[in-house]
Amino acid sequence: MKKIKFYETSKLNKKYENNFIKNIKKINQSGRYILGQNVNIFEKKLADYCKSKYCVAVGNCVDAMKITFMAYKINGDLKDGDEVLVPANTYIASILGITSVNLKPVFVEPDPETFNICTKKIQTKINKKTKAILAVDLYGRPADLFALKKIAKKKKIKLIEDAAQSLGAKIKTS
């Protein structure tokens, strides 16, 4: 059996190395490691790139998921014990973000072609406790957001997208 090598990001990142090291030195010399000017610049640039009014940088995916789900709970859209459909092959951070605010993850098998949450299998998991779908975009490929939006609208549940691995990806509209 032939071994398939895991993708080596070091090769992809090599062209950014000098700039990365220069900026790390600059931050290290400033003594400001939390918030500060660099975070403000990053948030502004990312908001502009995403054509969004706002951007809030967080330390990791667990924090991002936790803040998102907490906001829905504060708004009254979610409550303790509500179920969130999530891809079975997602990273643990998705699950920790859900469980850390007393919500229940319900695993949905991935689509074998895209490895994203399977829109057909989602239908079998939705019940009266289901209040949200967490679409986790994997390997640079967005989930089928058109189908997921239709399902969420029809079932009157929330759709949350974790696009950390697909930032900048485009979805065909025709």
Enumerate the predicted regions with their spans:
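N-terminal "arm"/small-domain region of PLP-dependent enzymes with the aminotransferase-like
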Residues: 1-32, 37
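Generic structural signal for small/hydrophobic residues in well-ordered secondary structure
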Residues: 8, 24, 46, 64, ...
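Structured catalytic cores of enzymes that bind and process phosphorylated ligands/cofactors
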Residues: 8, 54-57, 99, 108, ...
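PLP-dependent aminotransferase class I/II
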Residues: 10, 22, 39-45, 49-55, ...
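Phosphate-binding glycine-rich loop
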Residues: 32, 36-83, 97-101, 107
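Conserved coil-to-alpha-helix start sites within the AMP-binding
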Residues: 89-95
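Short beta-strand->loop structural element characteristic of the AMP-binding/adenylate-forming
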Residues: 104-114
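Active-site phosphate-binding strand-loop segment of PLP-dependent enzymes
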Residues: 113-174
